[in-house]
Regions:
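A conserved active-site cap/scaffold subdomain adjacent to cofactor or substrate pockets
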Residues: 228-300, 304
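N-terminal Rossmann-like NAD(P)+-binding subdomain of aldehyde/semialdehyde dehydrogenases
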Residues: 1-120, 443
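Alpha-helix C-terminal capping segments
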Residues: 139-150, 173-175, 193-199, 217-219, ...
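Conserved NAD(P)+-binding/catalytic subdomain of aldehyde/semialdehyde dehydrogenases
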Residues: 176-247, 251-263
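Conserved small-residue-rich beta-alpha loop and adjacent elements
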Residues: 104-170
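Long, low-complexity, intrinsically disordered segments
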Residues: 442-464
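C-terminal core of ALDH-fold dehydrogenases
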Residues: 319-435
Length: 464
C-alpha cells in the first residue's frame, strides 16, 4: 500500500487516490455496440453473446419454475436460513422508508399535493464472475417489493453448464422476484431496457456489474431509469491507537478480495501503527483463498494516509467520500456529525463492513468513486415515482392570476398568460350579470378523484 504523511495544516489531495473509473472508452464503445445489436436482433443476439461470453448455448433464457424448484432443493439449508434472516432485516429497515401521498388545502381552496406510485416493472442485475452474490438479490429486490413494484425481473449470467447458483434462486424466491433470466453482461442490460421476443422491457434497472454492465447502464439511461453507475468497490478505515491492527487489516482485506480494482484506504495517526496493520495483512494473507486478488488490490489501489490529528482525518474522509467508511476510533459517535460524505458508516470494532453487506438491514448498493458527495444508498425511494397534483378554485386563480401573467409575459409566453386572462375574464363576466350570484367557492374542495386515499392506499390529507 502506498503511504502519505500529512503535515499539520496540510489538506489531503484527492489526486492521490488514483481512482479507477466505472468504465473506460473501450468498454463504452463495446457496450454501445452490444446494446444496439440486442435492440435490433433481440433473442438471436442474446444467444450469440451468451455463447461467446458465458460459453453456453441457451435456447431459452427464462428460468422455468420447475428448474427453480430443482435448484432450491439443492440449496445449502444453512445458506437458505441465513438468507431468510437477512431478508427479514433488510425488509424491516426498508419498510421505514415508505413514502405516502399527501395533499394540502390552502385558505383559498387550492389543493396541491404529491401522489406516490410504484414503478410498474424493474430489472435487477446480479453479477457472476469471480463470486456469487445472492445478497445483491435481496438488496435490490426487497426495496422494490416494499415500494409496491408488481413485476421484479432478475437477470444473472449462467455458469458454464447453463445452471444458476441455487442460493441466487433461493434469494429470488425470498425477495419476491417474479421472473428470472439466465443472461449477463451488457446484453442483459439491453434486453431489460428494450425487450426481446421473449423478454418484456422494464422501466428501471438496478444492480452492480463489471465495466461493461456499467457502460451499458450508461447507454440505456436515457430510455429507462437506472440506480447509479457503480465503479469498483472501496473502503476507508479510520483507526486510532485503540483499534486492533489485526481487525483493521482483515477489514481492509475484506474489501480488497472483491476485485483487483477495489480501493482500500487506511487513515491513521502514526506510521508505526500503519506498519503494524501491514504486518497483520501479511499474516492474514497466508490463509486467504483469494490472496492473489487481494494482494493486487492492496498493492495497486491501497493507500495509507497518516494524519496529524482527528480533524485532518475527518477532512480526508470527506475528500475521499468512500463507499464504505469504518470508524475504529474512540468516541466515534461524537464524530458522526462531522462526516459529510460516505455511502455507509460502520461504527466501532464490532461492526465490520460484512454486517452491512449481508444482515444489518441498510442497503449495500452504495455510491462509489467519490459520488457519495451527492448520492445515497439504494432505497425504496428509487422504486417509486411521484406526480404533482394541483387543483385551483376560482378564488385561488383570482388571487394569483396577476402574478402568473406577469411572469409569463416576462418570459414571452403569450398563451400562458392568456390561459389565465381568459379565465379571469369569464369570472368577471359572471359577476357582472345582473342578479347573478358570485361563483360558489368550496373551501373544502378535494381533488377530482376524491377517493385518492383508497386508490393510493397510503394517501394522507393534511391541512396546513
Amino acid at each position: 500500500m502506498r503511504q502519505v504523511v500529512l503535515s499539520p495544516g496540510q489538506v489531503f489531495d484527492e489526486a492521490l487516490l488514483e481512482r479507477t473509473s466505472a468504465f473506460d472508452a473501450n468498454a463504452l464503445m463495446t457496450a454501445t455496440q452490444i446494446v444496439a445489436d440486442v435492440r435490433e436482433r433481440g433473442d438471436a443476439a442474446l444467444r450469440e453473446y451468451t455463447q461467446r461470453f458465458d460459453g453456453v448455448d441457451l435456447q431459452t433464457f427464462r428460468v422455468a419454475p420447475e428448474a427453480i424448484e430443482e435448484a432450491l432443493a439443492s440449496c445449502d439449508p444453512q445458506v437458505s436460513t441465513a438468507l431468510q434472516h437477512a431478508a427479514r432485516q433488510v425488509r424491516d429497515f426498508h419498510v421505514r422508508q415508505r413514502q405516502q401521498s399527501w395533499f394540502t388545502v390552502r385558505d383559498d381552496g387550492a389543493i396541491v399535493g404529491s401522489k406516490v406510485e410504484p414503478i410498474e416493472a424493474v430489472g435487477i442485475y446480479v453479477p457472476g464472475g469471480r463470486a456469487l452474490y445472492p445478497s445483491s438479490v435481496l438488496m435490490n429486490a426487497i426495496p422494490a417489493q416494499v415500494a409496491g413494484v408488481k413485476r421484479i425481473v432478475c437477470a444473472t449470467p449462467p455458469t458454464r453448464d447453463g445452471s444458476l447458483d441455487p442460493a441466487i434462486l433461493e434469494a429470488c424466491r425470498i425477495a419476491g422476484v417474479t421472473e428470472v433470466y439466465s443472461i449477463g453482461g451488457a446484453q442483459a442490460i439491453a434486453a431489460l431496457a428494450y425487450g426481446t421476443e421473449t423478454i418484456r422491457p422494464v422501466s428501471k434497472i438496478t444492480g452492480p456489474g463489471n465495466a461493461y454492465v456499467a457502460a451499458a447502464k450508461k447507454v440505456v439511461s436515457g430510455d429507462v431509469g437506472i440506480d447509479m453507475i457503480a465503479g469498483p468497490s472501496e473502503v476507508c478505515v479510520v483507526a486510532d491507537e485503540s483499534a486492533d491492527p489485526a481487525l483493521v487489516a482483515i477489514d481492509l482485506m475484506a474489501q480488497a478480495e472483491h476485485d483487483p480494482l477495489a480501493s482500500c484506504y487506511l487513515v491513521c495517526f502514526d506510521e508505526a501503527y500503519a506498519a503494524d496493520v501491514l504486518r497483520a495483512i501479511d499474516s492474514h494473507m497466508q490463509q486467504s483463498a483469494r490472496a492473489e486478488i487481494t494482494r493486487a488490490s492492496l498493492d495497486d489501489k491501497g493507500l495509507v494516509v497518516v494524519c496529524p490529528n482527528m480533524d485532518a482525518a475527518i477532512q480526508t474522509v470527506n475528500v475521499i467520500a468512500p463507499e464504505h467508511l469504518e470508524l475504529h476510533v474512540a468516541g466515534g459517535m461524537d464524530l458522526l456529525g462531522q462526516v459529510r460524505n460516505a455511502g455507509a458508516i460502520f461504527m466501532g470494532e464490532w461492526t465490520p463492513e460484512a454486517v452491512g453487506d449481508y444482515v444489518a438491514g441498510p442497503n449495500h448498493t452504495l455510491p462509489t468513486g467519490g459520488t457519495a458527495r451527492f448520492s445515497s444508498p439504494l432505497s425504496v425511494e428509487d422504486f417509486v415515482k411521484k406526480s404533482s397534483v394541483i387543483q385551483y378554485t376560482p378564488l385561488a386563480l383570482a388571487n394569483e392570476g396577476e402574478a402568473i401573467m406577469a411572469i409569463a409575459e416576462h418570459e414571452g409566453l403569450w398563451a400562458h398568460a392568456q390561459s389565465v386572462r381568459l379565465r379571469l375574464g369569464m369570472l368577471q363576466d359572471a359577476l357582472k350579470v345582473d342578479g347573478a350570484a358570485a361563483p360558489v367557492i368550496d373551501m373544502d374542495a378535494q381533488p377530482a378523484d376524491a377517493q385518492a386515499d383508497e386508490e393510493v392506499g397510503r394517501a394522507e390529507l393534511t391541512d396546513e
